[in-house]
Curated annotation (Swiss-Prot):
Assigned protein family: Belongs to the universal ribosomal protein uS11 family.
GO cellular component: ribonucleoprotein complex; ribosome
UniProt xrefs under PANTHER family: 40S RIBOSOMAL PROTEIN S14/30S RIBOSOMAL PROTEIN S11
Keyword flag Ribonucleoprotein: yes
Organism of this sequence: Xanthobacter autotrophicus (strain ATCC BAA-1158 / Py2)
Transmembrane stretches, start-end: none
Subunit structure comment from the entry: Part of the 30S ribosomal subunit. Interacts with proteins S7 and S18. Binds to IF-3.
Residue stretches in coiled coil: none
Matching PROSITE patterns: RIBOSOMAL_S11
One GO-annotated biological process of the protein: translation
Domain of life from the UniProt record: Bacteria
Protein name (Swiss-Prot/TrEMBL): Small ribosomal subunit protein uS11
Length: 129
């Protein structure tokens, strides 16, 4: 019996004028997710998805390339203004933000939403080099 050809679901173009850019900058990677106001994902990218491997993922340049990619995908959906939520201690925080502004988005607000414990879990042991 012949297999029925599976149809590739074409990504429909959403017309969304404003959204939220979530920048998650960890020590190992930087992930950028652009959502609408309700939190539905419009586009995403990360340093690892851009082809950077190992310690190169944690560089500011990798974060910049990932932010440019996510911004380009979001612009295809008609997005023009962004609120930015930055989370995490990584080195790609500022460069990702700068790349989003350089991509032509109007950044209306920047929030740091890094979770800070009120003396919660015991931290991992200190690294001695």
């Amino acid at each position: 019996m012949a297999k029925e050809a599976t149809r590739v679901k074409r990504r429909e173009r959403k017309n969304i004028a404003s959204g939220v850019a979530h920048v998650n900058a960890s020590f190992n990677n930087t992930m950028i997710t652009i959502t609408d106001a309700q939190g539905n994902t419009i586009s995403w990218s990360s340093a690892g998805a851009m082809g950077f491997k190992g310690s190169r993922k944690s560089t500011p340049y990798a974060a910049q390339v990932a932010a440019e990619d996510a911004a380009r995908k979001a612009a295809e959906h008609g997005m023009r203004t962004l609120e930015v939520e930055v989370s995490g201690p990584g080195s790609g925080r500022e460069s990702a933000l700068r790349a989003l502004q350089a991509a032509g988005f109007l950044v209306t607000s920047i929030r740091d939403v890094t979770p800070i414990p009120h003396n919660g879990c015991r931290p991992r042991k200190r690294r001695r080099v």
